[in-house]
Amino acid sequence: MQTLKSQRAMPTATPSDQKTTAFLTIENVSKVYPTAKGPYTVLENVNLTVNEGEFICVIGHSGCGKSTLLNMVSGFASPTDGSVQVGGKIITEPGPDRMVVFQNYALLPWLTALENVYIAVDAVHSQKTEAEKRAIAKDHLAMVGLTDSMDKKPGQISGGMKQRVSIARALAIRPEVLILDEPFGALDAITKEELQEELLQIWNDHRCTVLMITHDIDEALFLADRLVMMTNGPHANIGEIMTIPFSRPRDRDRIMEDPTYYQLRNYALDFLYNRFAHDDVA
C-alpha cells in the first residue's frame, strides 16, 4: 500500500492539537459472502490503523466494500478473516462506544426531535434522572442549532434538519467512534456545506474518532485528516491513503485557493477515474 504525501503549502496541525494514539485497528480483514455461484469476496486483506481523535474519510466506487467495512466497525457484521478492534478490544457486536449516522436519517417519525435524541440517551444512560437525560438531549440539539425545532417531528422539518437531529442523537451518548455513512449525500449543495462546517466544529469540541464514507472528494479534502481510497471489488482493498495537510481549524475559502488542494483533488480523481475506473460511475 502506498501513501501519498504531497507538497505542503499549509502547515499541519501541531502535535499538541492532535492525539496520536492508535485506537481503531482493522487488521488483515476479509469479508466473504456465500452465493449460489460460490464464495464472493467483497474485501480482502484490509489493514488500517486510525489514531484516537482522527478524522478519516473512505472513498471508492460502488461495490468496493465501503459500507461492508463500516458495518464491521459498527458491529453489524463480522469479518470472515482478521479482526477489528477499538481501544484494544475486538468488536463482536454493536455498542454505545460506536454510533452511526446514516444517509437516510433513521429517525422515528412519531417522535419529536427531542424525543428522538432522548430515547438514545435513555438507552445508554438509564441511571441518570429524567431531567439529566433531557438536558443532555437539549444541549446536543442546541449544538446543531435546533433549539427552536426540538418539539417538531421529522415530517415537519427539512432534510438538513433531520440530519442535524441524527448527528445530535449520535453524539449525545458521547461515543468514542462516530461512523458516518454518506450523511450528506441526499442534501443540496448549500445545506451540505453548512453541515460540513457544523460537523467540523462539533468534532473539534468532542474530539471523537470519525470514520466517514463519502463519494465527494471535495468533502473529504475539507473534512478529513486522511483519505482512504479503495480499489474496486470484488477482492477490494485499500489502494492508497492520502494525507491531507491543511491546518485546523479549516477555512474553506483559504483551502480552495491553495494549489495543494488541486494537486490532491486531481490525484484522487485520477485514482478513481483512470487507475480504478468503474463502468457504473459517470
Swiss-Prot record:
Alphabetical list of Gene3D superfamilies matching this protein: P-loop containing nucleotide triphosphate hydrolases
Annotated ranges, domain ABC transporter: 24-257
Name assigned to this protein: Bicarbonate transport ATP-binding protein CmpD
Gene Ontology CC terms, in alphabetical order: plasma membrane
UniProt key word Nucleotide-binding: yes
InterPro entries: AAA+_ATPase, ABC_transporter-like_ATP-bd, ABC_transporter-like_CS, ABC_transporter_ATP-bind, NO3_transporter_ATP-bd-like, P-loop_NTPase
The family this protein is said to belong to: Belongs to the ABC transporter superfamily. Nitrate/nitrite/cyanate uptake transporter (NitT) (TC 3.A.1.16) family.
Taxonomic classification: Bacteria, Bacillati, Cyanobacteriota, Cyanophyceae, Synechococcales
